[in-house]
Amino acid sequence: MSGITRDSRPALRAGVRLQQDRARDQWVLLAPERVVELDDIALVVAQRYDGTRSLAQIAQELAAEFDADAAQIEADVIELTDTLHQKRLLRL
């Protein structure tokens, strides 16, 4: 992993936007010269990347919202965040 922990507070990098692609009927992250399609789970996580909430807080919110195991949600949130960070879509 690239230094991402449960205390990381990610936000979208400058030039990256979360947008609904109406032609595809799908939410995407738009970055210069690329588009990353998001599934429903990645979308609810990406919507919370505001630079103020930690990954632990995001995981707790999602666990409560979906009545799911908090530890598993946190592991999944960290994994997704690491993937998007490696693609240079997030800042920490």
Curated annotation (Swiss-Prot):
Pathway: Cofactor biosynthesis; pyrroloquinoline quinone biosynthesis. This is PqqA binding protein. Functions as a PqqA binding protein and presents PqqA to PqqE, in the pyrroloquinoline quinone (PQQ) biosynthetic pathway. It comes from Xanthomonas axonopodis pv. citri (strain 306). Coiled coil: none annotated. Keywords: PQQ biosynthesis. Belongs to the PqqD family. The lineage of its organism: Bacteria, Pseudomonadati, Pseudomonadota, Gammaproteobacteria, Lysobacterales. Monomer. Interacts with PqqE. GO terms for molecular function: quinone binding. The gene is pqqD. GO terms for biological process: pyrroloquinoline quinone biosynthetic process. InterPro entries: PQQD, PqqD_bac, PqqD_sf.
